Amino acid sequence: MPYTPHTPEEIRQMLDVIGVKSIDDLFAEIPPEMQPRSFDIPEGMSEMEVCARIQRMAAKNRIDLVSYLGAGFYDHHIPKAVDNLVSRGEFYTAYTPYQPEASQGTLQAIFEYQTAVCRLMEMEVANASVYDGGSAIFEAMMMAARATRRSKLVIDEALSPIYRTMLASYTSNLNMELVTVAHNEGRSDKQALMDAVDDKCAAVVVQNPNFFGAVDDFTELFTHARSCNALGVISVYPVMQSVLKTPGEMGADIAVADGQSLGMPLSFGGPYLGIMTCTKKLARQIPGRIAGRTKDVDGKTGYVLTLQAREQHIRRAKATSNICSNQALCALRAIIHMCLTGPEGLVRTAELSMERAHYAADRLTALPGVSLLHDAPFCNEFALRLPVSAYDVVDRLVNHGVVPGFPLGGYYAGMDDVLLVACTEKHSFEQIGIMAELVGGML
């Protein structure tokens, strides 16, 4: 049966109310020569026919490829229990838990998520999430601008180009000055970043590991920023925070991340999760929901949304953002994933991913003309210079069922021969060996 939202009788009643005889009368102001004579719309199909057509379209997707794509989004193992638990009816909603008396389960889950990401980052305050890693970076910049009353922002070019494009778009009409400091062959130029930070700067924004996979320590940079009354903002890879120096240890004021690696499948680009944490001093500047723990009149532990005067449903004109229910369901996936994996499991995931990546780097750099882009330490992702176009290598290997990495020529000038390769615990040594042999056969 077709789904018809309005019956002929209902349409007739609506036309009578507005005083016209037919639907065509609604378009009478359009000159006849501009009105379409007909619409090139195919005949309707039955439900079975629609399903068959969609299946034929879906069959064009390649799901059998062994992929070494990363660039901020990684194919980590997700315990099967995550899907089962997050799909429970008590949780499966986008509703914001304004009513604590009816939302204790959801509020406690958000509180536990905030606690977990604060421990992971070694920061003091977390919100209930924002949309993704890029929006988290933007919100961090806005926090810095509000807190310092300054408009200059220093951006490391080794920050994800996806994020940098978003920042340029979001700030294009906000009278903010974005100063981009060039990278040095894939490494962050910390001295140049320090030179760019002055008493007019609101924040310096970096990433660790950076887009090229290089791991760094920004403690000195953040100390310098603090001496200029500017803030230190860092974007991180959540899984690798289990083995790397944390934002809190470096002295960052705001730490953000894309939480995709904590239980979110790649899913053609989303939905993902924006993680935001900060120091207690900036708690009233952070956007979005914050769940807090308290005691009720009977002395029982309860959970509520707190510091709500920051939010648009309380002070619309002066709100820190227009974030509403945001990615609460994705945040729930993240906390379930972290609880099922545990601290030791997260460390093991990072170690296995690093082990695979370093094996892949050794195999690939043994090929003639192939070298690492930089000599910085790396975790599970690294950039290679090839003796041929990286795009050509990818195009040819896809025909063999392998995506060997992410070509960087479209994002960085002079890098048509650079390939970004990422490994996770899901890649076997055998798969990596086959990929290396295929690359070698095309050089």
Curated annotation (Swiss-Prot):
<protein>
    <recommendedName>
        <fullName>Probable glycine dehydrogenase (decarboxylating) subunit 1</fullName>
        <ecNumber>1.4.4.2</ecNumber>
    </recommendedName>
</protein>
<dbReference type="GO" id="GO:0019464">
    <property type="term" value="P:glycine decarboxylation via glycine cleavage system"/>
</dbReference>
<dbReference type="InterPro" id="IPR015421">
    <property type="entry name" value="PyrdxlP-dep_Trfase_major"/>
</dbReference>
<dbReference type="GO" id="GO:0009116">
    <property type="term" value="P:nucleoside metabolic process"/>
</dbReference>
<dbReference type="Pfam" id="PF02347">
    <property type="entry name" value="GDC-P"/>
</dbReference>
<dbReference type="InterPro" id="IPR015424">
    <property type="entry name" value="PyrdxlP-dep_Trfase"/>
</dbReference>
<comment type="similarity">
    <text>Belongs to the GcvP family. N-terminal subunit subfamily.</text>
</comment>
<keyword id="KW-0560">Oxidoreductase</keyword>
<dbReference type="InterPro" id="IPR023010">
    <property type="entry name" value="GcvPA"/>
</dbReference>
<dbReference type="InterPro" id="IPR049315">
    <property type="entry name" value="GDC-P_N"/>
</dbReference>
<dbReference type="InterPro" id="IPR015422">
    <property type="entry name" value="PyrdxlP-dep_Trfase_small"/>
</dbReference>
<comment type="subunit">
    <text>The glycine cleavage system is composed of four proteins: P, T, L and H. In this organism, the P 'protein' is a heterodimer of two subunits.</text>
</comment>
<comment type="function">
    <text>The glycine cleavage system catalyzes the degradation of glycine. The P protein binds the alpha-amino group of glycine through its pyridoxal phosphate cofactor; CO(2) is released and the remaining methylamine moiety is then transferred to the lipoamide cofactor of the H protein.</text>
</comment>
<dbReference type="GO" id="GO:0004375">
    <property type="term" value="F:glycine dehydrogenase (decarboxylating) activity"/>
</dbReference>
